[in-house]
């Protein structure tokens, strides 16, 4: 049987990435060109800057991904691309490059939901058994997803306001930490104590929804009031207290979801899945189901995860036409 190679593209935000997946499960290359240094001085991602960077490096990323995989353009058998959710200008760069490559070589084009990519990155650890539950935590999303089979995703709970990664970056900015602040807050949290009383919104309510805006506001108010009074606060203790509140919320809702949807596997994915504190809480508290977390290199935005997610779409022959457009607000279906 002839080997099949998927060339995957991911440009939904501030990472330009191209990857090659062989025979559905062997990631031969996963090239990532990060823009973090360009966005640091702004304290967040600037959409126009992100789009320009994607345009500048996308061709080089394609060439490097093919070279690292040890294949040529003629060896590629399908092309996959993120078409949403994300920044519309950024999405269009990767999607346009993918469409051009597929059209030029007469290859099928596979549309992939960015969040499905995060979820299916867990496939790199071991074959997934369905049905399963997923906790997706990133800079733009916080949601619980029920997956009955590969490619069938239903949201069963999500944030009402801020995503967890967004909350990390906003409190990090208040403390003067470097963007993105998640890793530094995690490290500082392990050096401090949970001594500040921050709210855990909806933690006792019988639903699967999250809310982090109240926690973020309480943190900002505490920090601001201390500055106004000339009081000194421990950055380590602030981080420890903030992270403890976040983890209490995530764990409470995830446990409720596992009670409502009895599955054997919990996937935890997205950029915040790299958080050491979250991994520690999961290991200590979720012991009756298998917990699968992608390796660190596949937690952030990358094309490797898009390649993994495209496999089920390819098997279903869910191909896109040349009129496929970016959908910045693309979402999974919601399940009551």
From Swiss-Prot:
Record-level GO BP terms: tRNA threonylcarbamoyladenosine modification
Known catalytic reactions: L-threonylcarbamoyladenylate + adenosine(37) in tRNA = N(6)-L-threonylcarbamoyladenosine(37) in tRNA + AMP + H(+)
PROSITE patterns per UniProt: GLYCOPROTEASE (PS01016)
Co-factor: note: Binds 1 Fe(2+) ion per subunit.
Membrane among keywords: no
EC number: 2.3.1.234
Cofactor(s) for this UniProt protein: Fe(2+)
Chief location bin: cytoplasm
Keyword list, A-Z: Acyltransferase, Cytoplasm, Iron, Metal-binding, Transferase, tRNA processing
Covalent S-S links between cysteines: none
The protein's enzyme class: transferase
Domain of life: Bacteria
Residues binding substrate, per UniProt: 136-140, 169, 182, 186, 275
Subcellular location: Cytoplasm
Keyword Manganese appears in the UniProt entry: no
Binding site for Fe cation: 114, 118, 301
One Pfam family cited in the UniProt record for this chain: TsaD
InterPro entries recorded: ATPase_NBD, Gcp-like_dom, KAE1/TsaD, Peptidase_M22_CS, TsaD
Gene Ontology cellular component terms for the protein in this record: cytoplasm
GO MF annotations in UniProt: iron ion binding; N(6)-L-threonylcarbamoyladenine synthase activity
Family: Belongs to the KAE1 / TsaD family.
Known role: Required for the formation of a threonylcarbamoyl group on adenosine at position 37 (t(6)A37) in tRNAs that read codons beginning with adenine. Is involved in the transfer of the threonylcarbamoyl moiety of threonylcarbamoyl-AMP (TC-AMP) to the N6 group of A37, together with TsaE and TsaB. TsaD likely plays a direct catalytic role in this reaction.
Protein name, UniProt field: tRNA N6-adenosine threonylcarbamoyltransferase
Protein source organism: Streptococcus pneumoniae (strain ATCC 700669 / Spain 23F-1)
């Amino acid at each position: 049987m002839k080997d099949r190679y998927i060339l995957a593209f991911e440009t939904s935000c501030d990472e330009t990435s191209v990857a090659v997946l062989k025979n559905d499960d062997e990631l031969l290359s996963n090239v990532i060109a990060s823009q973090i240094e360009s966005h640091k001085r702004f304290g967040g991602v600037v959409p126009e800057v992100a789009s320009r960077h994607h345009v500048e490096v996308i061709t080089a990323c394609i060439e490097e991904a093919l070279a690292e995989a040890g294949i040529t353009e003629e060896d590629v058998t399908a092309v996959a691309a993120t078409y949403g959710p994300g920044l519309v200008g950024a999405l269009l760069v990767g999607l346009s490059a993918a469409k051009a490559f597929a059209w030029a070589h007469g290859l099928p084009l596979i549309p992939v939901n960015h969040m499905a990519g995060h979820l299916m990155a867990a496939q790199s650890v071991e074959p997934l058994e369905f049905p399963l539950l997923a906790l997706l935590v990133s800079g733009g999303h916080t949601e619980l997803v029920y997956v009955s089979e590969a490619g069938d995703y239903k949201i069963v709970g999500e944030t009402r306001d801020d995503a967890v990664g967004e909350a990390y970056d906003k409190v990090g900015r208040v403390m003067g930490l470097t963007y993105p602040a998640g890793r530094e807050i995690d490290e500082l949290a392990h050096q401090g104590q949970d001594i500040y009383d921050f709210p855990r919104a909806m933690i006792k309510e019988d639903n699967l929804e999250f809310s982090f805006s109240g926690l973020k506001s309480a943190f900002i108010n505490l920090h601001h009031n201390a500055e106004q009074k000339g009081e000194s606060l421990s950055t380590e203790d602030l981080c420890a207290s903030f992270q403890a509140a976040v983890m209490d919320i995530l764990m409470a809702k995830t446990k409720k979801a596992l009670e409502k949807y009895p599955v054997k596997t919990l996937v935890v994915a997205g950029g915040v899945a790299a958080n050491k504190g979250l991994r520690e809480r999961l290991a200590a508290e979720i012991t009756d189901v298998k917990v699968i977390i992608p390796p660190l290199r596949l937690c952030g935005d990358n094309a490797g995860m898009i390649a993994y997610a495209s496999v089920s779409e390819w098997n279903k022959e869910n191909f896109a036409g040349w009129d496929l457009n970016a959908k910045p607000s693309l979402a999974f279906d919601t399940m009551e």
